[in-house]
Regions:
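A short, flexible helix-boundary coil/loop motif
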Residues: 1-37, 49, 160, 167-169, ...
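Catalytic-loop motifs flanking and including active-site residues across diverse enzymes
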Residues: 139, 312, 338, 368-371
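Short, well-ordered secondary-structure "scaffold" segments embedded in the functional core
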Residues: 188, 211-217, 292, 323-325, ...
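Generic structural signal for hydrophobic core residues of well-folded globular domains
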Residues: 49, 53, 65, 80, ...
């Protein structure tokens, strides 16, 4: 059993000069900056995010990162000419080039950033699953790539509440582009999915939680795009046992509760900190029922704790074909762990939630640099795995909370010298 310990993952002290590994990683991205000084500002910003100091705003980073100042860091996020979307696309293609198992899935989820005041772009009193309540916050919709042994962020988009989208004065003050209009979180997720198609990101399926899985328009959007998916749904998800109208719609939990215990089988999906993660599962071929009565063939999957385990039942829906092994769908849906882990780590370790500006572009540039910084850590871990092949089953995807950044960078230094 592999025991994991929560550790600090940040650099204990900012070096006076560039880290050789970071310089190598960032070299391909310098093409997005017209001047060397501009690219150097990006390197200093990333270095600041990797530092152990808990505050990651421009003022604080300028005070602890040599070779820069608050004005340069702020200029990088606001007025400097560079295309953050194009840089992010290049980063995604770079990460896809890493030798890996190639069995990735696309994860979508949203996360909240608690805020004071009313001027930060998109901030409003709104519900966020991060806080489990209505509170003053910003919310982003995010896309993540996850294989069994490699996981990293793809894209993020700020959710713009209707009160912001329809307020011309606030839009102008926050520099919100004209093309950005009100969209639901599910609609934003579908747009991010379309972007992954344009980049040609190979993937086996889409995985989301019940906030998206219980959204018929989202599922219909996936099917219209010919996407396979395994999604979490709520207990009252509407299904029917047959296609004809004589088969009435029923709640998912009622149907699964009627199944005999002997029909449920134990499946384990990965190793956790306390051993194998496993539970009892049952799958039923049936139809989901839209609000207008339209029926779509797929799998209703139930999960309940095994003997001696605590926890509540969970429900999933998938449009995988009839011959798909249940073990495959179970393993896919539980990869959602990696986007939740990223949300926690990008905030706690890299300062994703600490952008203090008020503008749309600055918010997204900061997020792009956070994703770049996270990808740097994943890349370092990937390099070490290439030189330190281990026997036995593949290791889980890298997570910064499993190994300190200082150790990762120190070990990588021997590779780069």
């Amino acid at each position: 059993m592999r025991v994991r310990t929560k550790v600090d993952t940040r650099l204990p002290q900012v070096p006076q000069t560039q880290l050789s590994a970071l310089a190598e990683f960032l070299a391909p991205f310098r093409v997005h900056f017209a001047q060397a000084n501009s690219a150097n500002n990006l390197e200093r910003y990333v270095t600041g995010l990797l530092n152990e100091h808990p505050n990651k705003n421009c003022d604080t980073m300028a005070s602890v990162v040599p070779g820069t100042n608050q004005q340069r860091l702020h200029h990088l996020l606001t007025e400097m000419l560079w295309d953050e979307a194009e840089l992010n696309r290049q980063r995604v293609k770079w990460m896809l080039s890493l030798d890996s198992e190639g069995d990735g899935v696309l994860l979508f989820d949203d996360t909240g950033f608690g805020k004071q005041g009313t001027h930060s772009v998109g901030v409003a009193r709104q519900y966020s699953g991060t806080f489990g309540k209505v509170t003053n916050c910003q919310v982003t919709v995010n896309c993540h790539y996850a294989e069994r042994t490699l996981a990293w962020p793809i894209a993020t988009r700020l959710y713009l509440p209707r009160v912001w989208a329809e307020d011309g004065v606030r839009r102008q003050q926050a520099h919100i582009p004209e093309g950005i209009q009100f969209q639901t979180k599910a609609e934003i997720a579908l747009e991010l999915l379309d972007e992954t198609t344009r980049i040609a990101i190979p993937h086996a399926c889409v995985v989301v939680d019940a906030d998206y899985g219980d959204h018929p328009h989202f599922l219909n959007g996936l099917e219209a795009r010919r996407e396979r998916y395994v999604v979490a749904v709520r207990c009252d998800f509407s299904i029917a046992l047959g296609r004809g109208r004589e088969h009435r719609a029923q709640r998912a939990d009622k149907v699964l509760q009627a199944q005999p215990l002997r029909a449920w089988g134990t499946i384990h999906w990965r190793e956790g900190s306390r051993g194998r993660l496993r539970a009892k599962f049952f799958a039923l071929r049936c139809y989901r029922v839209d609000g207008d009565g339209t029926r779509h063939l797929g799998w209703l999957i139930g999960q309940r704790p095994g003997w001696g385990q605590a926890g509540e039942g969970k429900y999933f829906w998938s449009n995988f074909p009839a011959h798909t092994p249940l073990e495959v769908m179970v393993e896919y849906t539980h990869r959602r762990y990696w986007i939740e882990q990223y949300h926690e780590e990008a905030k706690g370790e890299l300062g994703w939630d600490q952008y203090q500006g008020r503008h749309w572009d600055g918010f997204h540039r900061h997020a792009v640099i956070v994703m770049l910084s996270y990808s740097f850590l994943v890349w370092l871990e990937w390099q070490q795995r290439q030189t330190q092949r281990r026997r036995g089953p593949p290791r889980d995807a890298f997570s910064p909370t499993t190994r300190p950044t200082a150790v990762i960078i120190a070990q990588s230094a021997s590779v780069h010298h």
